[in-house]
Amino acid sequence: MLKLHRLQPARLLASPRRRSAAITATFTLRLYSTPATNETWQSGNLKLSHVVGVSTPPLYENTTGRLLRDLAQTHADHPAIISVHQDVRLTYAELDRRSDILAVNVARQLGIRRGDRVAVCSGNSWEYPVLQLGLAKLGAVLVPLNPAFTDTQFHAALNNSQSRALIIQSHLSRGRRKTSRDITGLIRAATDGNLLPSVEKVVILDSMAAPPEDARMYIALDGERIRPFDSLLKWYSAESAADMPEIAYLHDVAEDRKYANEVINMQFTSGTTAMPKISCLTHRNLTNNGSLIGQRMGITPTDKICAPVPMFHCFGLVLTNLAILSQGGAVVYASETFDARSTLQAVRTEQCTGLQGVPTMFSAELELKDELKKGGHELLRKGIAAGTSIPVEMMNRLIETLNLDQLTICYGMTETSPVSFMTAPGDTLERRCETVGTVMPHTEAKVIAPNMEPGPVDLTPLPVGKKGEIIISGYLLQKGYHNSPSKTFEAMVADPANPEKVWMRTGDEGVMDEFGYLKVTGRLKDLIIRGGENIHPLEIENVLFKHPAVSQASVVGVPDPKYGEAVAAFIQLHEEYHPPRTPSGTISHKPGPSVEEIQTFVETNLGHYMVPKYVWFVPDFPKTASGKIRKVDLKGTALSLI
């Protein structure tokens, strides 16, 4: 049994480049596994759940800003960003130049320096990648904020991240319009030294959903501390690139390389706690993860990928912006926030070749039969589905209806930058639906015996075919959680066989096959234990998706006096099974399935012990802003109903 001894957590943050040096290990003698060679698992001869990705292409060892500079020289006049709802198109050269200007003005007008945090709260727009890349060039840290945060969450996020500046859209949308009064309150708080002591400057970004007068109204509150976003793009004609000392290092490859391991992004993890942890990610983490994703997707400069996913999340910043831009493709924003109809219209007008999304987004798009009949998606082939698995039925519909025959599946977490496993466009339909693919290049992964209790962790890999906790190692690991050394040490464990190596505990349960394909069976914390039987919600959800009337489904565990826990299922039906939506009842519909029919369907496909004791039909699901179903909310609802 491997026994890990952790030293004082403060050492990790004191020397982030040598984080593993802050962790030592003692262990009793035990045969330690050697990771399988690529030839071993690719040929189907893998015995233990331990794989290492290929070491080609080599990792990019420069900054994100330098990557954009190189891309702008290669693809200068090629479209990089297309914001349909703003009617704005930026070439690579324009994106490079605007991000240069923004970097300089953020330094000169806002007083931001390398390492300072800048919070950004905005919907999808051309300004977001300019901010993402401009702040990276300056060496400042982008802190993306979820527009759906409550005022209390905004205050906590700004204080916990110690952001020195806030760039916020004049009109925030959470699926419905948020009033100007709410935003005014946020801005007043941001300029209140007592409430948010770290925030020194506020920049107002005009929203397409509100007139420019709104921004001017906010600026009038405090002309010294509040300014318009346009001012950050002001170019002084007398200056040239050589007159910008703030980003002069970009011209020297060797000088630029010194900063590749610096943090440029602080991401709030997608946990459902009151204030999620803050993951610290570097140039090296993000540029490489994005580039490797784009390569596995097969992105080329001829591709236009429609991206309705939010930019405050890794799916938007990395799997979309960096993945597509790193390969010379174009990113298409259909709307500020996800709108299924706008997405399909943008695909049609821009003749997109790819589409990103989570299953709930794809489901909403497939429901718009009137929009789909208009066509215009004949060029669609590529894309990414992430967040949770895609049922076979949905994948078939995406291929038949939207031509997404090269849709890839990604697995990861914020703390791993985020993708560690991914399918390839050429993988079989079965593997793209039932697994998350194989390990990414320069990444190492294991499946180990699950142990959610504090204390020593056994890092010995399980035999293939055995379920356990997924752990990840490699360049993609975060530097740590901001101001949370104890949480960092719980999640990031040193390898006793190699003190320089650190493993990220994902908290996800999975099983690996002899070819190295990984199947994620669920969150360990979501496991339902019914009468001693382990039940994985994902297995039941995948079966429910097979029912012809079911559009979406989510399963949670609830207390049960006899078995300890019972299965509860929430189901959303397809549009045609909903009751009429008009008083006249002119909209045709089919009768939906009964609770008993659903229970019989599960029993027939899985067995009696997995049959939901409770079944509720719902019109919609509570979701995170990134589109994931909030199981914690469903569990609360279930507890109130039983």
Segments (PLM) and residue ranges:
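AMP-binding/adenylate-forming catalytic core of the ANL superfamily
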Residues: 149, 155-156, 355, 474, ...
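Conserved AMP-binding A3 loop
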Residues: 89-93, 255-257, 264-288
